[in-house]
Each structure stands twice: as structure tokens, then as C-alpha cells.
Amino acid sequence: MQQLNPSEISEIIKGRIDNLDVSSQARNEGTVVSVSDGIVRIHGLADVMYGEMIEFPGGVYGMALNLEQDSVGAVILGAYDTLAEGMSAKCTGRILEVPVGKELLGRVVDALGNPIDGKGPLGNTQTDAVEKVAPGVIWRKSVDQPVQTGYKSVDAMIPVGRGQRELIIGDRQIGKTAMAIDAIINQKDSGIFCVYVAVGQKRSTVANIVRKLEENGALANTIVVVASASESAALQFLAPYAGCTMGEFFRDRGEDALIVYDDLSKQAVAYRQISLLLRRPPGREAYPGDVFYLHSRLLERASRVSEEYVEKFTNGAVTGKTGSLTALPIIETQAGDVSAFVPTNVISITDGQIFLESAMFNSGIRPAVNAGVSVSRVGGAAQTKIIKKLSGGIRTALAQYRELAAFAQFASDLDEATRKQLEHGQRVTELMKQKQYAPMSIADMALSLYAAERGFLTDVEVSKIGSFEQALIAFFNRDHAELMAKINVKGDFNDEIDAGLKAGIEKFKATQTW
């Protein structure tokens, strides 16, 4: 019988141990304690980050929002009907990211960046974090370039600049979305990329908006992010941040982008729902204490960044170009109450507001912009020269007209000067009316404002102002196309352009009918 050598045995065992392939991995796992209303409580998870993605069986993901002593409260992203008590949940070590890039232009995606338009996968896109810190003070640049909305009343009186946050506020069904969509349509040839975020809207409404963008040739330049009314509160809360990340892709690479949040009232309601289900203490109107921070950290990401920021971000690939992300948040008020919690918050965060009024809308003044309450805190710095020069008296005329109209109801005999002011105000009010999906070019707008400013409307009947304006613009585009093209390209105002406009209008009034 062969004798076993102890040293041999130890060598064999040692060799086996050295060759053993140990492929075990450390996993941070916990157990689902409860599932209800899209909120999951998990016990046993350690080292979880706030906002970290948590993976559940069946490819379902959640996001950690409440980090308590003995449990984690997470919100489910999507359907949660497959989850049950006792299931395992594991940390991923990642925060939520969405696809970004030019491949998304012309597409409709959900809040997580998944395409929902039936046009196939997005292709080779990169991803970026949904929650990002806004650029610091040093990296910002002052706003001095315009974003043309195509609306006379906005571009003349409440100008919006690249990198500005301009709130559109008003009651339901008075043209807030229409104004934002027209602003997007007007960017199709301006080189500004657009992102439209629909929060809590009906799917039929969103489908109609997408169709209108396509009909007007603006969809190819736009990303549509949808978290419809039928989707979970978590997705409605995340959609604006996802859209903002998609817009920042362009800003950080020296491009200009415009983002519309339609609307932030519904995002605040969704966040309130999540917070109450997570048992956070309610505050005013049952909103949580951090609802201001919800909107401020989103809207602060809209900015104009300097050449140095773009150069540093792109590692020198893009030089000498500033980038901007302009935000048009929409807030819906109840019976014109702008002093409610969410409206006052957003008014204080933004750089001005366009206030739409129900009474004006119902009396046929559309867009129903109340020039007295609306303001742009960037102002003339972001206006083209010709519009800035010609729009000075428009706001004053409208403000004086409103004041005098109220006074004139009680006074029977008015002096000549007051009567002239009233008549001029009526004509300017009529001139500010504009059809939907018909944004105007700088030259068309300048022509209308010039006619009002220089008194060419005095002898035109109020009821015929609209047809006069249409005929005048058609006449100039036909007979003075060179002058109109010059205004559109440069936007300057000098004696030559002044003389050309004056002579053209005088000729039109002498030879044409309207």
C-alpha cells in the first residue's frame, strides 16, 4: 500500500485553492416591506444614496426619496402591479439618467427617454443625469440676444432673451399652450433647438400638439417629452428634469435651446402626492416644505453660459461660442389668483411673467396679454434694434387707454386730447390681436408697429385695422421685398429704413384698398 505524504497533500490542496475562481460579488440587498400607491418601503438596504436607482425583480426600477433609520421609501418608475411584499430589492449605485443628443430631435419620448411615437429605437445616444447642479455665477453671461416668439404683443412689450426664464401664467383655456407652441414654431429657422415637456396633459391634447408642430415644419427641430395624466405621479414629477437635461445638452455645447414646461402646476401636484404618500409633513395648501426648491433647482438650470464654460465643458472642441437654455414655464391659476402658493413661488424665481387674462380673452383680444401686469426683467437688452425703437409708445398707449377707458365710462364730455388717446388705444389694442399658428417675422412686426407709432392708423376704422395690417404686409412683401429682407437679416433702424417704410405706407394708403 502506497504511503501518503502529508507535504504532497498540502501542495495539492494549496494548488487547488490558488486555481479556484471566486466570482462572488458584494450586493447591497433589502426586502420589500410594503407596496402601495406607487410607493415602496424597503428594509435592510444600507449605503443608499438619495435619488439612487433601486432594482426590483422583473426589471422594475424605483428611486430612493426617503432615507430613514430602519427603512427606505422609494417611488416606482412605471407600473408596480408585479411587485409584492417580501420581494428582494437591490441598490444599483447609479442615479437616474436619460438619453440626450440630436438623435432625439423630431421624436416623442416618455419621462425616462423611451420613444413612444412608434418610429423605432432612438439609435446611438449618450445618457446624462436627470438631476444636475445649475451653472455657477462665474460661468454665466448676461442675456442680450433675443428669442423671437412671433407675437407682436410679446416681442414689442415683454421681450424674451436667450437664457431668460419667462413665466406664462393665466387661467385654464385662455391660450397659454398656444403661445408656447407658436414660440416653438417660430424657431424652425432660427437655429434654436426646442424641448416641449407635457406634464399631466391628456394624450389627445399632446397628439394634437405634435401634429400641429409637424404641419408647421417645427417637429424636426423639437423634442417632445410626455408624462400624461394617466401616468404615475413619479413620472410627472421627473418629466421636467428629464426635458431640462435634454435641453442642457445643446446649451453646454455652445448651441441655443428653448424649453417649455406645460405645466409646472401639475408637476407640483404630482410632487405633493408623492410627498404625502411618503408621509412627509404637509405645509401651506398641503404642499411639502421644499416645493419652492422643486421649481428653483429646475428653473436655475436655464441660463446663458460663457465661452469659457463651453470651452471647458467640450475640452476645447468648441471655442468662442456661448450657449443658452431659455425656459418658458407655464402656470395655471384658479380664477386669476396669482397670490396662491405655487404661482407666487414661480413668479419670484423667473425673470418676468406674461399674464393672460380671461376677461380679455372672452372679449376677443387674443393673445389675451395684460400689458399692465406682464413684465420682462431682462427688457430691452434682448430686443432687436428696430423693435426696441418702434415699441416704446405701444406699452404706454395701452396702459393709458385702459386707465382712460375706465374713466370715460363716467364722463360724458371728453376733451380732444383724451378722445385722441382713447381712439389711439383702441387701434393699438386691435393691432395687437393675432391669429394662432401665425407667428410674424421681425420685418412684418416692425411694419405694423411703425404704422401705429407714426400715426398712420388714425384715419383707419377700428373694425378694419386687421384687414389693413394684412394688406399692408402683403403689399410690402410684394413691392418692397428687398427692404423687408434687409430688416429681417440685420434688425437695424436708420434714416434709410425710416424713409423706406414711410414712403411705402404713404404709397399703399394712396393706391391700395383694404
Swiss-Prot record:
Its main location: membrane. It is an enzyme of class 7 (translocase). It comes from the Bacteria. It is a peripheral membrane protein. PROSITE patterns: ATPASE_ALPHA_BETA. GO terms for cellular component: plasma membrane; proton-transporting ATP synthase complex. The keyword Electron transport does not apply. Its EC number is 7.1.2.2. One of its GO terms (molecular function) is proton-transporting ATP synthase activity, rotational mechanism. Pfam families: ATP-synt_ab, ATP-synt_ab_C, ATP-synt_ab_N. ATP binds at G170, D171, R172, Q173, I174, G175, K176, T177. F-type ATPases have 2 components, CF(1) - the catalytic core - and CF(0) - the membrane proton channel. CF(1) has five subunits: alpha(3), beta(3), gamma(1), delta(1), epsilon(1). CF(0) has three main subunits: a(1), b(2) and c(9-12). The alpha and beta chains form an alternating ring which encloses part of the gamma chain. CF(1) is attached to CF(0) by a central stalk formed by the gamma and epsilon chains, while a peripheral stalk is formed by the delta and b chains. This is ATP synthase subunit alpha. PANTHER family: ATP SYNTHASE SUBUNIT ALPHA, MITOCHONDRIAL. Gene3D superfamilies: 2.40.30.20, ATP synthase alpha/beta chain, C-terminal domain (1.20.150.20), P-loop containing nucleotide triphosphate hydrolases (3.40.50.300). The keyword Translocase applies. It comes from Pseudomonas putida (strain GB-1). The lineage of its organism: Bacteria, Pseudomonadati, Pseudomonadota, Gammaproteobacteria, Pseudomonadales. Produces ATP from ADP in the presence of a proton gradient across the membrane. The alpha chain is a regulatory subunit. The record marks S374 as: Required for activity. It catalyses: ATP + H2O + 4 H(+)(in) = ADP + phosphate + 5 H(+)(out).
